[in-house]
Amino acid sequence: MPEKPQATHSEFGEVLGTEKAITIWQAISDLPQVGIGEKVGIFDYDKLAEFAYQVWSREGSKNVENHTTQNHSQRVLEKISSVPMGEGMKVFIDKYEENKVTYCGGYRRAKKHIPSYTVYWTRGMTSIHPEENRFLSPRECARIQSFPDYFIFKGTTIENYTQICNAVPPLLAKAFGCYIIKVLTGAEINPIPWQFSSRDNHQNYRGKVDSKSEDNNFPIQLKLPF
């Protein structure tokens, strides 16, 4: 019987003898700010990457695509704006009296400094952006799922959400694959393309990770499909 794989990252990091898990803010904070109802969804990188995961996500991509957002009705905007960080629709459910018993997992606003909730697309909604009063864009969901920016999703925004949120995260799939290879052959393969850690900070990368630079030749171990 194969041994259980050893954890490499956790929310509590050094307390458990692991690297600290990547937070949602470390995954998406370098993406361009986008307004409600953005339909084109193609942007230049207008910020420098501050964390290793952002550096890895940008490798091989000259711009940001699939960064589209939905138009929200005034009623939906009222709901979104009423949800504080780390909470969900339970904060307003008595007011709107909907899905009171059957579904209470929607309208969740992610906390910035912990790993993201599982990305989902259901009933026309996904998680709320930590700071902005809108749902996450498909590209933000893709970052959370560990799709690099060069991976472009085709179809409508709704189809993009469905593709991304129903997918097995690529880095998770790679970790499974590497462990299966280890069990079958004994070969050790590091599934982590970068030593991602919440201890990373902008001092490590500022000034040398602008993806528009021709000198940006960071290593990458994940190419899709694989």
Annotate the PLM regions:
Residues 1-42:
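Flexible, glycine-/basic-rich loop-and-beta segments that form/coincide
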Residues 33-226:
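C-terminal target-recognition/interaction regions appended to catalytic cores
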